[in-house]
Amino acid sequence: MYITCLDVEGVLVPEIWIAFAEASGIPELKKTTRDEPDYDKLMNWRLGILKEHGLGLKEIQETIAKIDPLPGAREFLDELRTFSQVILISDTFTQFATPLMEKLGWPTLFCNSLEVAEDGEITGFKMRVEQSKLSTVKALQSIGFDTIASGDSYNDLGMIQASKAGFLFRSTDKIKADYPQIPAYETYEELLGAIKDAIK
């Protein structure tokens, strides 16, 4: 019994923080897990910048409302779900992801939650579990699933390497060079074909 686990940002939707960096004119916020492998460190750094600029959840949600899935993402997901169970596993937060999930046809999403003050300031974040992507894949394997995983960043490598089949998708040249043993794809058609082959 196979289940496909996909990263979200950079794979199905644009990077939320890059979009917000551009909308807010704060280029430092363009740093993502492609650049910083330590997610806690990255998020705490981001929250510090938001506080410094007096920005909160409302401003980020206004940017997210204007974001559409990457071209072809919805069709890819719809096709994938015809032959595999699919779970999206992301280090993003429910307060960010909901409008994007609607545009993707409400797939199952495992993510985290933000701690938000009454005035909208993001005061912290609550991760569902340590190493959420790897932990989720291992938990699925423990109940009889073979997992197939794909993502683009450092924080996807654990679930990719622990799965029966794993693929990089639209990753960086550095990650592809550092992990040449992981097949890397650039188009949804290629990724769909690789997942189909893995399930055969």
Residue ranges with predicted function:
Residues 94-98, 156-157, 192:
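Short, well-ordered alpha-helical microsegments
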Residues 94, 161-163, 196-200:
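An extended, acidic
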Residues 86-91, 145-186:
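Acidic, Mg2+-coordinating phosphoryl-transfer loop and its flanking beta/alpha structural elements
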Residues 117-124, 176-183, 193-198:
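Short, charged, surface-exposed secondary-structure boundary motifs
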Residues 111-116, 171-175, 189-191:
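Short, acidic/turn-prone active-site loops that include or flank metal/cofactor-
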Residues 2-113, 117-118:
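Alpha-helical substrate-recognition element adjacent to the catalytic core
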Residues 78, 138, 157-158:
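Alpha-helical segments flanking ligand/cofactor-binding loops in enzyme cores
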Residues 95-147:
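Substrate-recognition "cap/lid" segment bordering the active-site pocket of phosphatases
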